[in-house]
Amino acid sequence: MRIAAIINARAGTVLRMSPSAVTERLSVVWGSLGHDAAIILAEGKDMGRMVRKACRDPDIRAIIIGGGDGSLSRALEHVLASGKSLGVLPLGTMNYMARQIGMPLDLAQAAVALAGAVQTPMDVGRVNDRYFLIRACFGAFPEFIQSRDRVRRKGGSFLEGALAGLSGVARRYRIVEAELSSPGGRARIATSFLMISNNLCRDSDPFLLERERMDGGSLGVYVGRSAGPVGLMELGLQAAMGRWASNEALFQGEMHWLEVQTEQRKPLISIDGEVEKMEGPFRFDILPGALSILVPK
């Protein structure tokens, strides 16, 4: 099978191993298993250009994205339009999607797993015209990610990044004031945390976020019960312990669509770990079985 592997040259694993070591390891593994693989290193806007080019190639059957969850999310628009399968090569920090589908985190083991993976339909979340695989968040979490990633880009450790993230939240504490509209009616909220996930979350290991399933055809909606810093601290501690379904600091709901009208015209939003300012209002919905993803046997 001919595949295209587009690798984020700025991904953590690539920087640790060196780009040449990563491409050589993948070439050896896939070549030994009889796969014809085009391995492309790219960064920034070139990632999107290379994904788009590979998706237009009729000879390529699968698009492998090497990077973090943000790299996967950014590739969705082109992969969905092409009808090709998406493969996950976990080279990022948290690699939530890889963990969700049982992909090994070791580079060589992941390459072997991808070679024998099974095409599996999976739901995709959407906010306005942007797709996501894991979650979108408003409030304190985007601030946490921004501050954390500044430190990580400078070579800081996971712990140093986490501490910087907490410090950033303390300095720029944000309250989300919004009107929510859903099939169940309308509600006004004032909270420090609003998360919309691709399917409902379950309790998991510490620092992870796992969904109950990836083909349930619904969004999970999580709203912090308190707008104050004490409530946010309680929520964050429970989330850090992997408590999502049993997190008492959250209101939780399940729905097929949700509209969010924030008081702020262009609030910060994190989508699969990438932070940006996006203009509202925000329309969230779920696309059942829209993506063919390669899942290890």
From Swiss-Prot:
It is found in: Cytoplasm. Its main location: cytoplasm. It comes from the Bacteria. Its EC number is 2.7.-.-. GO terms for cellular component: cytoplasm. The active site is at residue 274. GO terms for molecular function: ATP binding; kinase activity. Belongs to the diacylglycerol/lipid kinase family. This bacteria makes up to 60 cubo-octahedral magnetosomes of about 45 nm in diameter which contain membrane-bound crystals of magnetite (Fe(3)O(4)). This is Putative lipid kinase MamU. The gene is mamU.
